[in-house]
Amino acid sequence: LGSEGRTTKECDYLNQVIGKERLSAYTANISFTGFTAPKVLWMKNNEPENFAKIHKIMLPKDYLAFRLSGNYSTDVSDASGTLFFDVKNRCWSEEMCEICGVHKEQLAKVYESYETVGTLLPEIAQKLGLPETVKVAAGAGDNAAAAVGTGTVGNGQCNISLGTSGTIFISSDQFAVDKNN
């Protein structure tokens, strides 16, 4: 959950080990308690027996896509909220994985939100009464999808979302980092 608060020590550790500026340079974020990497690091530090059992690390919508298609996948918007993802180079960060004790094989293949990650598994198609040719898309994180839904897609467009969390999206045609982050 984004409201998870147990990971404050892990966030401080990541911000110190990598450095806020360096972390922000490739993730466009600082370490925040709601992100996946601090949660995984917390598990490593506090529940090592469960940490050792991790097969795949995925977010809820990605688990649903896996159950529908049998493929491990995520999209760029959700990957960017894990802190394992190098947003600038659009790949998993070897450095962050190493620091957290995660193997890249434990992370899903990353797609653009609109890309197809697979089609329905035969048993799922049959259960749902749908053809096996139904495509499963990578999808998007909630705020990223909301930004697109509100038309925040042109360079310099802004979307402010206030709810369980507060998010400000400013669309850009290039990678940019908030120097005050």
Tell what function each PLM region has.
Residues L1-N181:
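Glycine-rich phosphate-binding/catalytic subdomain of phosphoryl-transfer
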